[in-house]
Amino acid sequence: MPSMDESTLSASSRADLAELGQRLYDEALVRREDELITDPRGQPIGWLLDTRVPMLDGELFEEVGAVLAERLQNRGGHQVVGYGFGAYPLVCSVLSTDDDRFKGGLVREERKEHGRRRLVEGPLDEDAPVVLLDDIINSGRSASQALRLLRRDGWEVEGLLTLFNFTWSSGQERIRAEGLWTDSLLDLNLKDGRSSGSDSA
């Protein structure tokens, strides 16, 4: 079940975040009983979280954007980037809030070879740091790949903010070892051993 870091939240905020997290989890959860799902090697797995489903729902999109924006404001971050289809809706949700200080960027897998030939699309200030957004931090491989691409392109990445942290994995530690702060709205304490899986971070 999802849980959250309660140290800086009021009782009402904790309840609101728990309720939002449960809705995100319930709508994102896909089980093998419902459809065939596989890991990157093509082997069947028991479940995964497809956060694109709830994040492309208008109501949850706005609610999550408001929560992410508040976390970013508390850390002084106003430039956000996303790498991959799980992250792109998060970037857009932050930009949909009333705070017009936010700027967003979408990170490509490789620099575009024509046109403006950019790795990162969006109106970002290249001299200011960015915060990487992602839906899930699991092993940290996806976030590490995004970090390498961004650093190679000259960007300073100061932190990683995700919806879910899979607490049984070491992804957050892996990213912190790169000198970034990490934060997740919710810790996922569920473990399903061999049948666990996610196509994200």
What does each model-identified segment do?
Residues 68-78, 151-153:
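Phosphate/pyrophosphate-binding loops at sites that engage ATP/ADP/AMP, CoA/4′-phosphopantetheine
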Residues 2-73:
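Active-site-facing substrate-recognition patch
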Residues 85-131, 138-145, 197-199:
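Short, glycine/charge-rich flexible loops or terminal/linker lids adjacent to PRPP-binding catalytic cores
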Residues 78, 128, 158:
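Conserved acidic residues
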Residues 76-86, 161:
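Short glycine-rich phosphate-binding loop at a beta-alpha junction
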Residues 2-26, 147-201:
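PRPP-dependent phosphoribosyltransferase catalytic core
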Residues 72, 95-99, 150, 175-176:
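A generic structural signal for well-ordered alpha-helical segments
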Residues 112, 136-139, 163-169:
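Short Gly/Pro-enriched loop/turn and capping motifs at secondary-structure junctions
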